[in-house]
From Swiss-Prot:
This is Acireductone dioxygenase. One of its GO terms (molecular function) is nickel cation binding. Changing E103A: Loss of dioxygenase activity and strong decrease in expression of soluble protein. It comes from Klebsiella oxytoca. It catalyses: 1,2-dihydroxy-5-(methylsulfanyl)pent-1-en-3-one + O2 = 3-(methylsulfanyl)propanoate + CO + formate + 2 H(+); 1,2-dihydroxy-5-(methylsulfanyl)pent-1-en-3-one + O2 = 4-methylsulfanyl-2-oxobutanoate + formate + 2 H(+). Changing H141A: No expression of soluble protein. Its EC number is 1.13.11.54, 1.13.11.53.
Amino acid sequence: MSALTIFSVKDPQNSLWHSTNAEEIQQQLNAKGVRFERWQADRDLGAAPTAETVIAAYQHAIDKLVAEKGYQSWDVISLRADNPQKEALREKFLNEHTHGEDEVRFFVEGAGLFCLHIGDEVFQVLCEKNDLISVPAHTPHWFDMGSEPNFTAIRIFDNPEGWIAQFTGDDIASAYPRLA
């Protein structure tokens, strides 16, 4: 179940607000300029789908976003607990960073935790299957895939080069709850 928990940057252990209601989550995030929507990830992808299979299954969703925002490229990120690079990838994504473009993800399997550092608050968004999130360009954030990752998401970019991060050097992520 998708969830949003809001913390003060001054008190990372006690939440200010929490909800698992998709409409409430959407309202809170939209107020901060973050797009959050529930889409349908209802295609049968099989046991170990290739990136091509995932893209073909959800080309209609990609086309919708391209038509709306003019995105130029897309790919698929799929990580499982047996990935030999899972620890290195988790550490990389857990470092607060920004992008020069919106970070758009459509989760078609599993879950991951986006943590957005907006002003004096941190918004932890548990994204699961059916969730579309678009983090605005230049928003400091980090992503936690958990110690045993299990997710597949379509990533959509303005930049044809794909995922390019500018790390902030702030260790804020270490103070907040993580996925197990």
